[in-house]
């Protein structure tokens, strides 16, 4: 056994043992030490027996005791070696366990690194999506602000279009007069169609007029995919046959601009109108009514894009041209003043706004009479300007004047039996303060209020809402509720006779009710707003009659029937006689072409409607 242990020590000095070799050698040495320990134990027992047999004090007894001590010392060393070997084996097991745990931890670290990388990728993707979402939110907020702006414009529209359901004050004003189409603006020059043709030096071909009618119908039906190619093809043909600088090309550019305007493509429409303006200035002169119409339409496009400063000088120049051509007291000059006032109001130039509205009001009252709807509309606009400046007393006075005048037109007088609606509202307010504990007022006691609700028109409805809001601001809740309920009742009454008159016109049955006055240049149309579904038309016969269109759906139905007649005309078949009046839905305004009327009676050719001015 001693030789085995010594043999383990005889390894070359330069050889480096591995951990497995060390553990194997340790186990062998431990086994050898155990055997050696057993051998020493047996020898020690033998010596102990020998000592007992020997006599005391003998020489041999001392030697045996010495051997026993040596054996015990050797056994202690052997036991120490065994203990160290066991410690080494236990340490090896512990190190093996630690290494195993270490490998497990490394595997976990690798998994965590992979998961961390995946989370980083997910975070990067999420950040990108968040950035795109924030951009989308910013874009939607801009669109929301734009839509709120349009909604606020419609709240101040006095023509009672589809947005009159909304209530409350608006921070922007309606551009109700700011985008009359060229067909509406062109007659505003006060000249006859024949005179306009002489001014321009050319006559619009019948084919272009027919094409224009088709484009208007397609646009009114929302079929822009058909209307736009038609316009572009016609424009290419006209440029090829007549040249780029011909006035008829400018007319076609205006038609295409109107189609783009219907698609809310204001930038493209503005480019086309700029081209048309250049052509008309070079061919017709800078002071031609057609130039004024194009300037007005271009100013509107800038206004719809919020560029009021750029729009104001264009509108101002259009006003100067119309004053020069038509005179300072023409109704179309008043209409241009309304447009200019609205632009100034959106810029906060309230002093100029009041000046323009008062001048327009004086023109309307002097030329058309105090009962003309445009007088009420202008007063309503002026009252809105007062509201923005906090001049509530002045605004309230104008609103009451509008309602009182409408009441007088309906009932003939103001007395105890026939009171305007605002008087009933204030009486109910006073009564509510006295009888606030008794609930609602009996029907019979306030029958006059329900009778006063019969006074209804778009301007009156708008005035009712605005005055109701003003009453609420003053704390007159009962009076405000009375006016609001009256406005609501009038909207629920359905199609009124005025709407039926407009529909009859569209069907060719209302020609007898339309007269034009040479001195005033026919009829002037006012658009109710950007997306209005109702348009109001003033007939220049001095009667002050207000003609209001029906809903957009009814207009489209009429346009579909009219399109069939135009298609038959293009195919060569004769349509049955009917009125050639063709009206366009409110989003694209109305197109009025009285072909049966004599040229000297109809309104003058304004630049934007030259394509419709002459008959085939």
Curated annotation (Swiss-Prot):
TPR repeat boundaries on the chain: 55-88, 208-241, 250-283, 292-325, 334-367, 376-409, 461-494
Region (Disordered): 160-198, 507-526, 597-616
Keyword Acetylation part of the UniProt annotation: yes
Subcellular location: Cytoplasm, Cytoskeleton
UniProt-listed PROSITE patterns: KINESIN_LIGHT, TPR, TPR_REGION
Family affiliation: Belongs to the kinesin light chain family.
UniProt protein name: Kinesin light chain 4
Gene this chain is encoded by: KLC4
